[in-house]
From Swiss-Prot:
It comes from Chlamydia felis (strain Fe/C-56) (Chlamydophila felis). This is Phosphoglycerate kinase. Pathway: Carbohydrate degradation; glycolysis; pyruvate from D-glyceraldehyde 3-phosphate: step 2/5. The keyword Hydrolase does not apply. Monomer. SUPFAM superfamilies: Phosphoglycerate kinase.
Length: 403
């Protein structure tokens, strides 16, 4: 890794400003999934062991950017964090201003402070509108640490502008380091082969960049979900009422041509679970893609033969990357394909298996397999952009390693 990590710093008795990603799902004031909080704990605990004063900053949701909104407060996060740390964690009522400055000034070594939601200020998402916002955040710390991989593809103030005020003193956190190790070293730089990528989700256009990048890396590319039907239609198959991105058909044709030139095997569904709607309890059946999906039905999941074929390829692979569900996993039985892939990855411990955040990470969690794959990324969009470009705005501004 060519950037400093938190282990390269000397944070003893110093204030360390840490950008974390605590953008967790909350309902009725309760956190539904705290994986992002748990994922940040190694960095937080490391700094506390070093007797640093740790100042955490994060966004949550999409507030208007015009001041405090209770439903977007980080208070529920504080309660979970206190449980993991075993001691009180103060929440500054704002991330800038006199109350924030006082909270930072009073913070002792070996303790943690959380600043209130960064997005209560427009300056977080629009750095050009409020340079003073970045300047004040930058004034809080002696060092800066970015452990928010999931937001590092955005040029927001806290991940892109603030670290530039810490030349030689801004570093990757332990979670960020792990993300870059798996997505960079294990997937882009030196993947074990055969290398298989599985891409699902709705649109070809939203993933065309990463698809084209992966065509330079992988041996097998398995395509399903909504984008799978777009590829099938590009090949002249009858896909009925299935989700098809008409504007993506030309892109799909181009991808198929590039794959052929680069000797990459593209594998598409050979059968599908179909129904008139994706409502729970709806009557469904399986049909062969060669026979065609009837005009009044839509493909909602990969079929039994496709599951077997996909799993056979996964079992024979040494590296596997998965992003995007292959069916409507929220509605049984159209979750069977995605669940089968999750379980297939979990029973393949000899391979490097990386799940690219987002819905695929949700499927892995539902299947109870998160701990049985090599790495579950905390960033959906960030992981795809990193695979496409090989860097993120938030990682490029971290201090390079010395020498």
């Amino acid at each position: 890794m060519d950037r400093l990590t938190v282990r390269d710093l000397s944070p003893e008795e110093k204030k360390v400003l840490v950008r974390v990603d605590f953008n967790v799902p909350i309902k009725d004031g309760k956190i539904l999934d705290d994986i992002r909080i748990r994922s940040a704990m190694p960095t937080i605990n490391y700094l506390l062991q070093k007797r640093a004063a740790v100042i955490l900053m994060s966004h949550l949701g999409r507030p208007r950017g015009s001041g405090f909104e209770e439903k977007y407060s980080l208070q529920p996060v504080v309660e979970v964090l206190e449980g993991y740390l075993g001691h009180h964690v103060p929440l500054a009522p704002d991330c800038i201003g006199e109350v924030a400055r006082q909270a930072v000034a009073q913070l002792s070594p070996g303790r943690v402070l959380i600043l209130e939601n960064l997005r209560f200020h427009r300056g977080e998402e629009h750095p050009e509108e409020d340079p003073a916002f970045a300047a004040e955040l930058s004034s809080y710390g002696d060092f800066y640490v970015n452990d928010a991989f999931g937001t590092s593809h955005r040029k927001h103030t806290s991940v892109y502008t603030v670290p530039q005020a810490f030349p030689g003193r801004c570093a990757a956190g332990l979670l960020m380091e792990k993300e870059l190790e798996f997505l960079g070293t294990h997937l882009l730089i030196s993947p074990k082969r055969p290398f298989t990528a599985i891409l699902g989700g709705a649109k070809v256009s939203s993933k065309i960049g990463v698809i084209e990048a992966l065509l330079s890396q992988v041996d097998n590319l398995l395509l399903a979900g909504g984008m799978g039907y777009t590829f099938l239609k590009a090949l002249g198959k009858s896909v009925g009422n299935s989700l098809v991105e008409e504007s993506g058909i030309e892109l799909a044709t181009r991808v198929l041509q590039i794959a052929k030139q680069r000797n990459v095997r593209i594998v598409l569904p050979v059968d599908a679970k179909v129904a008139k709607t994706c409502d729970s309890g709806v009557s469904w059946s399986e049909v062969s893609i060669n026979q065609g999906i009837p005009a009044d039905l839509e493909g909602l999941d990969i079929g039994t033969q496709t599951i077997q074929e996909f799993c056979k390829i996964i079992d024979a692979s040494a590296t596997v990357f998965w992003n995007g569900p292959v069916g409507v996993y929220e509605v049984p039985p159209f979750d069977q394909g995605s669940m089968a892939i999750a379980n297939c990855l979990a029973r393949h411990p000899s391979a490097t298996t990386v799940v690219g955040g987002g819905d695929a990470a949700a499927v892995i969690a539902l299947a109870g397999c998160s701990s049985q794959v090599s790495h579950v990324s905390t960033g959906g969009g960030a992981s795809l952009e990193f695979l496409e470009k090989g860097f993120l705005p938030g990682t490029e501004v971290l201090s390079p390693t010395r020498g």
